Every structure is written in structure tokens, then in C-alpha cells.
């Protein structure tokens, strides 16, 4: 049930291992840190990592008359989370389903979860372009979807896959809000100097080629890695870091597009 959701943002990646779920969770936490009510929906059915990234593993989902009740990270209910990871007995249990069963589960996630009033719903998708993505886009035709953010890394193979994602967005009619280049450079935990370990600026060049905003370049920062397994936002814990600055910029970009003012 998305009738109380003001804005829907889909997060995509061309391939796995680019840090898409980390970006999704930190974006959701950044939106919450700036005064928004946020929902985070993890539809990566075969590799759900959002419960782990937020330290919510082992939490149980309950049903009410209106559907599934998402997991809330705090008493004020400013961040609600839903993932198939909450429905599995063990984190290591594989989800071995064919396409139709995956499609049915995603439709349930989009129609049978009792979201309260949300400023933003962030949908973390599996990598690539598959049945899951097509199902999401079909379901969101009845609900205003603001668009998609693509996460990539500087390597050439990742950038090649992003081109496929851009084509996918065009063919499915979803607006591309921008590209985030992740894992670009390594931040020394001692002096905080950032050193490029892969090629750089690939995300910016691709955004320019596709004529969409380049939302920022996120480095590999061990200090941000320490935040995994908690609901701590880089904006609160590392306010002066480049990661926090980029996330703050993305939040401002989304607020400008959606006309939803931040409180903080």
C-alpha cells in the first residue's frame, strides 16, 4: 500500500558488488537525518543485505488486518524497513525461486506492506535488469515514481553495465535522476587523504554522456564501513567526511526535485 507514500526512488546497479545496498541504506539514513520520514524496501530476493547493513537481522515481521507491518528502527517510526531477509529463518538460507514466484513476492511487497505516511520510499533492487525490475516498474505505473538512481564503480566493466541500465530506464519509461560513482578512491583512516586505486571520473563522464546529473563520487572510507550493522548515518557520525557531503548533496537534489523540504 503506497497511498501514503509521497515519493518513490528506485536504486539500480548494472552489476553486483558496487555497493548499491550500502548507498541505499546510507541514503535512507541521510534522508531521515534531515528530518524526513523514510521507508526502505529491499527487493533483492536472492541477496537481501539491508537487514544486515542496518543491524536488524533476527527481527520478525508481523501481520495486521491491512498487511505486513514493516520493521521500525526507532520509536518515532522515522525509518521503516521491509526485506525478504526478515522472512528467512537463517541469513544463509538461499531463495531458489523461479520468475513467477519472485514476481508474486515483489507485488506483495509493493501492495501488502502497511507503510505509514512517508516522505520517501527507497527501493533497493537486485543488480542487472531482470524479472524483479520489470515487476517493480509495472507496479509503479499506478503510483507516482520519481525516478531511479544508478550506482556504479569506476571500473570499465561496471560502466559498460550501467549503459544497459540507462537503456532499461528509457525503455521502461522511468526517469533517471542521476548516477552515483561509488568506491572511487580510498580514504586513509589516519590522515583522511583520498587516493585513487581504480580509474576515476567514469561515473561523471557517463552521466555527461547520458545527459543526467552526476550526483557525486563516494570513496572507500573505512570509517563509513564501521557504521555497517547499525542505523547510524554518516551525516551524524562523520559530518565532515566526503561521504556525508555527497549524501547531503543527494538529499538536497531529491528535495529540490520533489519539493519536500528538509527540517534539519
UniProtKB/Swiss-Prot annotation:
Family: Belongs to the Mrp/NBP35 ATP-binding proteins family. NUBP2/CFD1 subfamily.
PANTHER family: CYTOSOLIC FE-S CLUSTER ASSEMBLY FACTOR NUBP2, NUCLEOTIDE-BINDING PROTEIN NBP35 YEAST -RELATED
Cofactor notes: Binds 4 [4Fe-4S] clusters per heterotetramer. Contains two stable clusters in the N-termini of Nubp1 and two labile, bridging clusters between subunits of the Nubp1-Nubp2 heterotetramer.
UniProt name for this protein: Cytosolic Fe-S cluster assembly factor Nubp2 homolog
Binding sites annotated in the UniProt record for ATP: 14-21
Record flagged with keyword Cytoplasm: yes
Entry function: Component of the cytosolic iron-sulfur (Fe/S) protein assembly (CIA) machinery. Required for maturation of extramitochondrial Fe-S proteins. The Nubp1-Nubp2 heterotetramer forms a Fe-S scaffold complex, mediating the de novo assembly of an Fe-S cluster and its transfer to target apoproteins.
An example molecular function term from Gene Ontology annotations: ATP-dependent FeS chaperone activity
A GO biological process held by the record: iron-sulfur cluster assembly
Annotated S-S bridges: none
Subunit-structure text: Heterotetramer of 2 Nubp1 and 2 Nubp2 chains.
Amino acid at each position: 500500500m503506497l497511498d501514503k507514500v509521497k515519493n518513490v526512488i528506485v536504486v539500480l546497479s548494472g552489476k553486483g558488488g558496487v555497493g548499491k545496498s550500502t548507498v541505499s541504506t546510507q541514503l535512507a539514513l541521510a534522508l531521515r537525518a534531515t528530518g524526513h520520514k523514510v521507508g526502505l524496501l529491499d527487493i533483492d530476493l536472492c541477496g537481501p543485505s539491508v537487514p544486515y547493513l542496518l543491524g536488524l537481522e533476527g527481527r520478525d515481521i508481523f501481520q495486521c488486518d491491512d498487511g505486513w507491518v514493516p520493521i521500525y528502527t526507532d520509536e518515532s517510526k522515522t525509518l521503516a524497513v521491509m526485506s525478504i531477509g526478515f522472512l528467512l529463518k537463517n541469513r544463509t538460507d538461499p531463495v531458489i525461486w523461479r520468475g513467477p514466484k519472485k514476481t508474486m513476492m515483489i507485488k506483495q511487497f509493493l501492495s501488502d506492506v502497511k507503510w505509514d505516511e512517508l516522505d520517501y520510499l527507497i527501493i533497493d533492487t537486485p543488480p542487472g535488469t531482470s524479472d524483479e525490475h520489470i515487476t517493480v516498474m509495472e507496479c509503479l505505473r499506478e503510483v507516482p515514481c520519481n525516478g531511479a538512481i544508478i550506482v556504479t564503480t569506476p571500473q570499465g566493466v561496471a560502466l559498460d553495465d550501467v549503459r544497459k541500465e540507462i537503456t532499461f530506464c528509457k525503455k521502461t519509461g522511468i526517469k533517471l535522476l542521476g548516477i552515483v560513482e561509488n568506491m572511487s578512491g580510498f580514504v586513509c583512516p589516519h590522515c583522511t587523504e583520498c587516493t585513487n586505486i581504480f580509474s576515476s571520473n567514469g561515473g561523471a563522464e557517463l552521466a555527461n554522456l547520458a545527459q543526467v546529473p552526476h550526483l557525486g563520487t563516494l570513496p572507500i572510507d573505512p570509517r563509513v564501513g564501521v557504521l555497517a550493522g547499525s542505523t547510524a548515518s554518516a551525516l551524524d557520525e562523520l559530518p565532515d567526511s566526503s561521504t556525508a557531503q555527497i549524501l547531503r548533496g543527494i538529499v538536497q537534489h531529491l528535495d529540490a526535485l520533489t519539493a519536500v523540504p528538509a527540517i534539519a
